[in-house]
Amino acid sequence: MGACWLSCHLYEQLELDRFWAARLPDSREGTSWQHILQTLVCYRLIDPGSEWRLHRQWFEQSAMGDLLGEDYSLVSKNALYRCLDKVLPHKTALFSHLRQRWQDLFGATFDVLLYDLTSTYFESDPPDDESDKRRHGYSRDKRSDCVQVVIALIVTPEGFPLAYEVLPGNTADNTTLRGFLQKIETQYGKAQRIWVMDRGIPTDEVLAQMRQSDPPISYLVGTPKGRLTKLEQALLKRPWHEVRDGIDVKLLPDEQELYVLARSRARIDKERAMRQRKLKWLWSRLKELSTMRLTREELLMKLGAARTKARAAWRLVDIEIDPQIAAFSYALNRDRLRKVRRREGRYLLRTNLYEHQPAELWKFYIQLVEIEAAFKNLKGDLQLRPIYHQTIERVEAHIFVAFLAYCLHVTLRARLRPIASGLTPRAVLDKFVAIQMLDVHFPTTEGRTLILSRYTELNADQKLLVSQLDLELPPQPPPRITAAGQIARASAPAL
């Protein structure tokens, strides 16, 4: 009972019930599309799975029917799929609605926007329809053998999602930004926004257009370390500025931009430990291979496997393979190792924010972890995949439902932040799952059965959370009477 009730409360707090009531009216047969969508979203938040599982198992074992005043007919298989077909046209209106709710509930501001991309894959053959977005492309899930779609997401530094877009799986990262800039300006107007992005997303051409825009569009962008080689001599002459404990930056003004070299001592330790571990393994493996009696083909295959596993550490070792026999020699490239050591734990950023303090610039950039957390929650807690749908329209609707569930997740996290920052939304939902609705059966003299549904008493943790979140449990439901011979629901639902 508890998790369903809490999810419905979050849904209503975002006024999604009011938003969808105006856009998903009931059918002539009385099908409540908005209640079906609410069930899909709460299911995705609480115990994600397929629509088939929702239809066959989860709904009957949950309290969603009691909370919504609906019976099992609400989640007939066809109704679930037909509901998915109705939601996508309202995506843009939903973004505007959510922006206002984030502002009203939490005082969210939209001066700084974080932008990033992820992908989700499908274990299926490429579709014949050329307009289908499921395509092969660069896979962040390391599944280049599978077709995929790319998901672009914009969130605020506090993690409140503002918009997303589903793109073809073969979309190059650096071709996505221009379209998103135009969409945000069209929907919300031009404003003094700061866009924070990781390297590889904007091209030099797009950044130039952002600088020349009226008003100029501000940005802070990660830059590939290869550019550090060109700027290394100039940066050596610049002083370090401590912006916080363990974080130092150097500033290098250019003609139209400001370069920021950031150094994190904690990151240095982490990257150095990772590099040492990989290099130690590679050195041991090369020593092992040098003592094996292998054919030339076997040697090349094993060296290739070692290179794949060692990754960046492979470039720190010079390997010479004898062209005549199955033998090789190897030696540590100390010059390259010294160069790598100098760059460990360092980030090169570029921006047109000349007037901001170094500490502000660093704070903006590290907030990219919020969008990384969003992708982690979508793929982890909310189980974005596997996706079982066959058409791209329903695939996009599935992602849309996951996005709505993530909005509930973010709302709960924002509510927890000032009162219990150490608790995750998933931990709270798990605590509320333990609140059960029990059916107590009393036979009557007329041969009928009186059923009293009662939820279990809250334990200390649950009472504290209900109090701290300023919640009030719903009243105990009224008794029900079943006719003689009618089979009542035997299992107790989780509220």
Locate the predicted segments by residue.
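Anion-binding and metal-coordination hotspots
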Residues: 1-6, 11-495
